[in-house]
UniProtKB/Swiss-Prot annotation:
One term under GO cellular component: membrane
Domain named Ketosynthase family 3 (KS3): residues: 46-469
UniProt name for this protein: Putative inactive phenolphthiocerol synthesis polyketide synthase type I Pks15
Pfam families: KAsynt_C_assoc, ketoacyl-synt, Ketoacyl-synt_C
The keyword Transferase is assigned to this record: yes
Region feature Disordered, mapped onto this chain: 474-496
Active site feature: 216 (for beta-ketoacyl synthase activity), 351 (for beta-ketoacyl synthase activity), 391 (for beta-ketoacyl synthase activity)
SMART domains in the cross-refs: PKS_KS
GO BP of this protein: fatty acid biosynthetic process; glycolipid biosynthetic process
Length: 496
């Protein structure tokens, strides 16, 4: 009897041990799976985002990324006199006296050719509705389509997909015009929220559609949000960028009162001769995708966005006054988000508006971050596309991104125009930072080319983004042949 009880006790213990073993084995497997999911989440949260397509329109006849590169690589200045086809009282607007009421002391800006042109039939929009549509909405439809074609993606294939649209836009002067007789389309035609929503509607996209207004930093903030959405899994593809079309000359009049404009309309970024900003306009969209997805789907990678950050000036010297410490912080956070150090970045496409207050503050922030610790013979290079085509406002950030993507692909850092000599308002000896007064070959030793882009909004919202050249050489750009599904638009709109 005692022996039987002992045997039963041993068997019971063995069964308990076996149960415990299987339980612990199950827990170990679940723990491994949890760790794997956590690693995947952490990797996705910091995964580089690929730029797989670009669409844009800018002054000087720029109708694609190759056109923009032609302008900046040739050192062209595309500023011109006020257009005569917008109904502006060009002669009556001008007065050299900055205090003249309702006048502007400049006749110059950088303007789009045929800013109101639009293929309404292709997009299936009735003529009566098109008349009520802000040209900015029309442009976003066209450059979004072009950007997808540039990426080799049939726009109509995305219907029902988790594709997001993030549009930087803040000027809505078209809505101030007489909209009588437009049959109720005025509200949707001039709403900045619809600039994103209309792209999603026309293409049938079901990811987030967000219009971003942080003034001059709008398009870079839009790209930052698109990156965050991709990394979180909220969307699988994103169209991000910005647009500005000056339907009325009110921004010239307003900034003339503040004496913030250059009389000749030229942005002389970081120059001793800097005397104010010059206004421009344009539209740009980049197609963004998680790098792992771009590789899996065989999409050409034009460049990689390694990291980005957005912050606010807070209580600075004034609502519209830049905050140098906040600019330093946004740079540091963007570098941390990218997993890089300041020494890993070769060039910064600066905000560089050529104002006597803003440029010195921005330069000092760059000197205090990127300019420290590196050899003087290998400085951080600084430039600004605003010297070519003015301050394109809500499209300024994406213009800088496109410029830097193209510069990395061509291996050249373009010159910044109108710099007679570096600004004496900046202590350039406090760090290793130099202005690109001439084009330079972009040579690197055993690592990828990297660039940063800055945008600062007049409301105090700052953005900074870190770009890296594509991990493998991208194939030469070629127009996407139109298919039956694109109705022939591929040949017409994919212009490089």
């Amino acid at each position: 009897m005692i022996e039987e009880q002992r045997t039963m006790s041993v068997e019971g213990a063995d069964q308990q041990s076996e149960k415990l073993f299987h339980y612990l084995k199950k827990v170990a497997v679940e723990l491994d799976e949890t760790r794997a999911r956590l690693r995947e989440y952490e990797q996705r949260a910091t995964e580089p985002v690929a730029v797989v397509g670009i669409g844009c329109r800018f002054p000087g006849g720029v109708d694609g990324p190759d056109g923009l590169w032609d302008v900046v690589s040739a050192g062209r200045d595309v500023v011109s006199e006020f257009p005569t086809d917008r109904g502006w009282d060009v002669e009556g607007l001008y007065d050299p006296d900055p205090d003249a009421e309702g006048k502007t002391y400049t006749r110059w800006g950088a303007f789009l050719d045929d800013a109101t042109g639009f293929d309404a039939g292709f997009f299936g929009i009735a003529p009566s509705e098109v008349l009520a549509m802000d040209p900015q909405q029309r442009l976003m439809l066209e450059v979004s389509w072009e950007a997808l074609e540039h990426a080799g993606i049939d726009p109509l294939s995305l219907r029902g997909s988790a594709t997001g649209v993030y549009t930087g836009i803040f000027a809505a002067s078209y809505g101030n015009r007489d909209t009588g007789g437009l049959q109720g389309y005025g509200l949707t035609g001039t709403s900045i929220s619809v600039a994103s929503g209309r792209v999603s509607y026309v293409l049938g996209l079901q990811g987030p559609a967000v219009s971003v207004d942080t003034a001059c930093s709008s398009s870079l903030v839009a790209i930052h949000w698109a990156m965050s959405s991709l990394r979180s899994g909220e969307c699988d593809l994103a169209l991000a960028g910005g647009v500005t079309v000056m339907g009325l000359p009110s921004i010239f009049v307003g900034f003339s009162r503040q004496r913030g404009l250059a009389a000749d309309g030229r942005c002389k970024a970081f120059a001793a001769a800097a005397d104010g900003t010059g206004w421009g306009e344009g539209a740009g969209v980049v197609v963004l995708e998680r790098l792992s997805d771009a590789r899996r789907l065989g999409h050409s990678v034009l460049a990689v966005v390694r990291g980005s950050a957005v912050n606010q000036d807070g209580a600075s010297n004034g609502l519209t006054a830049p905050n140098g410490l906040a600019q330093q912080r946004v740079i540091q956070v963007a570098l941390a988000n990218a997993g890089l150090s300041a020494a890993d970045v070769d060039v910064v496409e600066a905000h560089g508006t050529a104002t006597t207050l803003g440029d010195p503050i921005e330069a000092q922030a760059l000197l205090s971050t990127y300019g420290q610790g590196g050899p003087a013979e290998q400085p951080l290079w600084v430039g600004s596309i605003k010297s070519n085509m003015g301050h394109t406002q809500a499209a300024a950030g994406v213009a800088g991104v496109i410029k830097m993507v193209q510069a990395m692909r061509h291996g050249v850092m373009p010159a910044t125009l109108h710099v007679d000599e570096p600004s004496p308002r900046v202590d350039w000896t406090s760090g290793a930072v130099s202005v690109l007064t001439e084009a330079r070959e972009w040579s690197v030793d055993g690592r990828p080319r990297r660039a940063a882009v800055s945008s600062f909004g007049i409301s105090g919202t700052n953005a900074h983004l870190i770009l890296e050249e594509a991990p493998v050489p991208a194939p030469a750009e070629a127009p996407v042949e139109a298919s039956e599904s694109t109705g022939g638009r591929g040949r017409r709109w994919c212009r490089g």
